[in-house]
């Protein structure tokens, strides 16, 4: 799920703006990864990567690389838009996995896909306005965070049916738990210990038990691409001011997208460098 969340400039033709700076460039990437466009919905694109018998079972790992390339492409377009005095595009991307074939409804000759992964990716790509206002100044290198509020002020870190989770996803890629588990089946993920310079405000939202995992994704024509995954606990916050209370036992997963992080990868040529 790819969602455009930036306001349009007054007087601009929205259709032309989306087509030129988002839809057309993304369509070229979809062809590269043999991905299908399920449908357009307002300011969003729903994309599917299907696994077929006889093909390499790498749908999630290649979806991660596709999402990374989309964000990289948008960063380049945003530089041009900024120089032209036009509003920049901001995306939130979500990757969900369903371990079964999708169903289809027929509308004449047109197939309409029915899949739980569509709704899940929509949720993963979302960004709560209040959370964005709170976290945006302190997001740092990471682009995805998840907060939880509860009706029970004495919550001990567990989860209940009353809990509400809210996402921060600005220029990020959020991975569902089933997608993360499928990714671990597709490629080997190794722990990566690295210390980045962060302000005290940025560190506050970083889980001290969080992990960074790095893996290599095989692509077409013998190419490979490194990806980094951040695994973090969900933060329990005070509903009144979104101040951090404690860390819960829930997890969320981010496909790291910041070029500075990939530039720090040891050894092999990083994904960021390969885009130059």
Regions found by a protein language model. Name each.
Residues 95-97, 117-130:
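Alpha-helical scaffolding flanking metal-ion-dependent phosphate/phosphodiester catalytic sites
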Residues 1-65:
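Catalytic NTP-binding/metal-coordinating core of nucleotidyl cyclase/transferase enzymes
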Residues 11, 108-112, 190:
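Short secondary-structure boundary/capping segments
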Residues 32-59, 78-115:
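Catalytic core of nucleotidyl cyclases, primarily class III adenylyl/guanylyl cyclases
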Residues 3-6, 48-52, 75-76, 125-136:
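Short regulatory "switch" loops immediately downstream of catalytic or recognition motifs
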Residues 129-276:
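Intrinsically disordered, glycine/charged-rich C-terminal tails and inter-domain linkers
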Residues 16, 24-28, 62-83, 129-161:
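Acidic, metal/cofactor-coordinating or nucleic-acid-engaging core segments within structured domains
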């Amino acid at each position: 799920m790819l969602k455009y969340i930036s306001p349009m400039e007054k007087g601009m033709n929205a259709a032309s703006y989306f087509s030129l700076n988002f839809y057309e460039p993304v369509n070229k990437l979809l062809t590269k990864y043999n991905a299908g466009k399920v449908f357009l919905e307002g300011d969003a694109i729903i994309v599917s990567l299907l696994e077929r018998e006889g093909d390499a079972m790498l749908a999630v790992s290649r979806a991660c690389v596709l999402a990374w390339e989309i964000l990289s492409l948008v960063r380049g377009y945003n530089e041009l838009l900024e120089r032209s005095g036009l509003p920049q595009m901001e995306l939130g991307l979500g990757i969900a996995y369903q371990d079964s074939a999708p169903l289809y409804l027929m509308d004449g000759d047109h197939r309409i896909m029915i899949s739980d992964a569509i709704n899940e990716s929509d949720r993963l790509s979302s960004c709560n306005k209040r959370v964005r206002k709170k976290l945006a100044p302190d997001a740092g290198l990471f682009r995805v965070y998840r907060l939880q509020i509860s009706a029970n002020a004495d919550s001990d870190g567990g989860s209940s049916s009353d809990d509400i989770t809210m996402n921060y996803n600005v220029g990020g890629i959020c991975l569902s738990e089933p997608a993360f588990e499928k990714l671990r089946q597709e490629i080997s993920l190794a722990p990566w210990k690295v210390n980045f310079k962060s302000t005290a405000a940025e560190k506050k939202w970083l889980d001290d038990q969080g992990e960074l995992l790095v893996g290599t994704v095989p692509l077409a024509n013998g190419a490979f691409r490194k990806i980094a995954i951040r695994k973090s606990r969900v933060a329990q916050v005070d509903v009144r001011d979104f101040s951090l209370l404690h860390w819960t036992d829930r997890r969320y997963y981010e496909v790291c997208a910041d070029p500075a992080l990939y530039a720090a990868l040891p050894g092999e040529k990083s994904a960021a460098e390969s885009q130059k």
